[in-house]
Amino acid sequence: MRLRHAWLVLLLIALGTTDADAQRRRRSMGGQRYNANGVFGLGLELGAPTGLNGKYFLSSDRALNFGIGVIYDRYYYDRRDGLHLYLDYLFHPFSLTNNPTFQLPFYVGFGGRIWDFDDYRGRDRYDDGYALGARVPLGLAFDFNNVPLDIFVQLTFVVDFFFAYEDRAGIHLEGSFGIRYWFD
């Protein structure tokens, strides 16, 4: 229920923002095929992980993407859940479409993550551990030109190195989507 309220608040903020606010945040940093509409955005991400997401543009087509949240993983009868922190460096090489209402940039990047989790076997808590991982996110961002919002869809390839009771590596494919409000 709280999640619905959060989405409703973000929607009301977006609808209450004028076109002048959106135009004020527009900028161009050169002749790139994709030019970011804002510098710093903050929002919600759902999927793997679920939590807060932020994006900070270093130039018109390069950004830092970061987040904090929880992630839930199930492998046969075992499951892991816990705190997830990540940081990615993103490239936005091109936009699939540029029209007056929105841009649709493709992005790819690389980064890392820390995952502090509890491990469960059946109904019993088995142990806790952590993983350090390398990430390669691929995604699309629906970057609206007239309101300071973007909606993103992302697939991330992850290689985790697990530490604690069992040292090993694992490969994952994770998906998420979310919405961000741009402050400038």
Each predicted region: which residue ranges?
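Cleavable N-terminal export/targeting peptides
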Residues: 1-34
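Short glycine/proline- and aromatic-enriched beta-strand/turn motifs that initiate or cap beta-hairpins
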Residues: 21-76, 80, 84, 184
